């Protein structure tokens, strides 16, 4: 099959996809929704141990714009989520996914917003951090934000928020079983980087071709993500 000319955004996404498949982020699995479409990714997120989300299997969709990485992608949970920074339709509200415009009313610094040096790896790490440490100052779900603050400020004595999350976690187990996925429940299991094999060798061929297009200057220097670090603000209280 003849290969079509790849756009700069497709080249960037191909490089990122290969990097994430070879050096995955702990707690995530990345696949393409369609092998022929680099602009739509499916993400499986495993709930971090020692948090309310422990044992959960949450699916999400990342959609990239044509001008990526100059504009940010969107990140939408497909799994029903009750969280201060997740809208009812699953869209995640987080600074790193906001366009790089100067908006004093938002309360966000320009440095907190998207810029072309960000990538999927930093998005994934930001999302998993957000799950455990919600931003209650600018919530997407006001009711969830109020409920979370009550749970946090009461040190777990107000259990309404925790009970909703546990029910959602429990509901994801059937989906994990259907997908044949073993969800990690210990820190040791969670820290294992699961490589997702490509369905064929087409991505390798495309990846190799990138170096024939004089894009060696696009090499990214990415630090390996440290494994999940517990934080008291999101840990379960007994």
UniProtKB/Swiss-Prot annotation:
Changing residue 106 to R: Decrease in substrate affinity and ubiquitin transfer rate for neddylated CRL2(FEM1C)-UBE2R2 complex. The modification Phosphoserine is found at residue 233. Disulfide bonds: none annotated. Residues 98-113 are annotated as: Important for ubiquitin transfer. The active site is at residue 93. The keyword Phosphoprotein applies. Residues 206-238 have a biased composition (Acidic residues). One of its GO terms (biological process) is protein monoubiquitination. Residues 194-238 are annotated as: Disordered. Neddylation of CUL2 in the CRL2(FEM1C) E3 ligase complex increases substrate affinity of UBE2R2 and the ubiquitin-transfer rate in the E2-E3 complex. The keyword Phosphoprotein applies. Gene3D superfamilies: Ubiquitin Conjugating Enzyme. Pfam families: UQ_con (PF00179). E2 ubiquitin-conjugating enzyme that accepts ubiquitin from an E1 ubiquitin-activating protein, and catalyzes its covalent attachment to other proteins by an E3 ubiquitin-protein ligase complex. In vitro catalyzes monoubiquitination and 'Lys-48'-linked polyubiquitination. Works in collaboration with various Cul1-RING and Cul2-RING E3 ligase complexes. May be involved in degradation of katenin. Interacts with multiple Cul1-RING E3 ubiquitin-protein ligase complexes, also known as SCF (SKP1-CUL1-F-box protein) complexes, including SCF(FBXW7) and SCF(BTRC). Interacts with multiple Cul2-RING (CRL2) E3 ubiquitin-protein ligase complexes, also known as ECS (Elongin BC-CUL2/5-SOCS-box protein) complexes, including CRL2(FEM1C) and ECS(VHL). When phosphorylated, interacts with beta-TrCP (BTRC). This is Ubiquitin-conjugating enzyme E2 R2. It comes from Homo sapiens (Human). The lineage of its organism: Eukaryota, Metazoa, Chordata, Craniata, Vertebrata. The gene is UBE2R2.
């Amino acid at each position: 099959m003849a290969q079509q000319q790849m756009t700069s955004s497709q080249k960037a996404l191909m490089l990122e996809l290969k990097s994430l498949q070879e050096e995955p982020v702990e707690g995530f699995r990345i696949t393409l929704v369609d092998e022929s479409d680099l602009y739509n990714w499916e993400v499986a997120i495993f709930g971090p141990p020692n948090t309310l989300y422990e044992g959960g299997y949450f699916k999400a969709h990342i959609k990239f714009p044509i001008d990526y990485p100059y504009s940010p992608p969107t990140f939408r949970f497909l799994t029903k989520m009750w969280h201060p920074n997740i809208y009812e339709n699953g869209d995640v509200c987080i600074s790193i996914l906001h366009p790089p415009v100067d908006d004093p009313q938002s309360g966000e610094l320009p440095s907190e917003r998207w810029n072309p040096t960000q990538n999927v790896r930093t998005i994934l790490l930001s999302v998993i951090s957000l799950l455990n440490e919600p931003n209650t100052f600018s919530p997407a779900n006001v009711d969830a934000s109020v409920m979370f603050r009550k749970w946090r400020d009461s040190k777990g004595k107000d259990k309404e928020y925790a009970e909703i999350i546990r029910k959602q976690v429990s509901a994801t187990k059937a989906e994990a079983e259907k997908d044949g996925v073993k969800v990690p429940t210990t820190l040791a299991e969670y820290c294992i980087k699961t490589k997702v094999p490509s369905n064929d060798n087409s991505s390798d061929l495309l990846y190799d071709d990138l170096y024939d297009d004089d894009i060696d200057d696009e090499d990214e220097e990415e630090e390996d993500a440290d494994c999940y670090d517990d934080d008291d603000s999101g840990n379960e209280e007994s």
